[in-house]
Amino acid sequence: PESYTAVRSLLTPWLDRLWQVPGNHDDRAVLRTVFHDRISGTADQLIQFDFESAGWLCLGLDTHVPGAVAGRISAAQVDQIRSRLQTSSASRCALFMHHPPVLLNSVWMDAIGLAGRELLGALCTAEPRIQLICCGHVHHEFHGQLATAAVRTTPSTGIQFAPDSDTPKFVPGCPGFRIIDLTPGGYTTEIQRISTPSIPITN
C-alpha cells in the first residue's frame, strides 16, 4: 500500500483524469483501495477503462494474472473491444495494456509475454481503427506493429532491461516514461527520461 500511496501523492494534480491498468507486480484489491475514487468494482475484478478524446476511443485492458509474471487477454475482453468499437463513432482507437501483444525477439521476455495475443491480433486485422497500442512490462523502449496498430512500449521508471536478450540483463539507463498526444489527425509520442539513473545495476 505504501508504494501506491506514494504514487497517488505524486499524481495528485492529475487525479481527475488518471486512468490505470494493472501490471504483473500489482495487486488489484490494494490498487482499488488506494485509488478508490478512480477505480470502480470490487476485490479482484478486472481494472479497465473506457473514454473518448479528440476523436479517439481509449480503452484500458487488464492483462494481469494473479501470481504470474506473464499476462493474458481473454476472448471475452476482445469481444468487449469489438462491441465498444461498434458503438463508438470515434475515428481511431488506442489500447493501453501492461503486456505487449507482440513478440519482442527476446527469448526470456517473450516467454513471459501475453497469452491470447492472437485473438487481439485478429481483431486488429479486422478493425483498422485500432491504430495505437501502448504497453509496459519490458522495461525498455520498443517499436512494433500489430496489423495497422503501432505497438509502443515504455522504459521502466526503475531499472532498464536489455532488448533482444536471451536472458535477463540489466543495462545502464535513466528511468523514463512515455508522453502521448492524441489529436483528431493522429498522434505524436516521445520518451522523457530523468537526468540521472536512480538505481545502481548489477548483473
PLM regions with names:
Residues 1-39, 122, 126:
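Core catalytic region of metal-dependent phosphoesterases/phosphodiesterases
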Residues 7, 23, 61, 81, ...:
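Divalent metal-coordination and catalytic microenvironments
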Residues 25-27, 64, 100, 137-139, ...:
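Catalytic metal-binding/acid-base residues of hydrolase active sites
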Residues 29, 67-70, 103-107, 162:
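A short acidic, helix-capping loop that chelates divalent metal ions and anchors anionic groups
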Residues 35-49, 138:
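Alpha-helical scaffolding within the catalytic cores
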Residues 55-65, 94-96, 149-155, 190-192:
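Active-site-proximal beta-strand elements of phosphoester/diester hydrolases
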Residues 71-150, 187:
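His/acidic metal-ligating clusters that form di-metal
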Residues 123-125, 142-203:
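Binuclear metal-dependent phosphoesterase catalytic core
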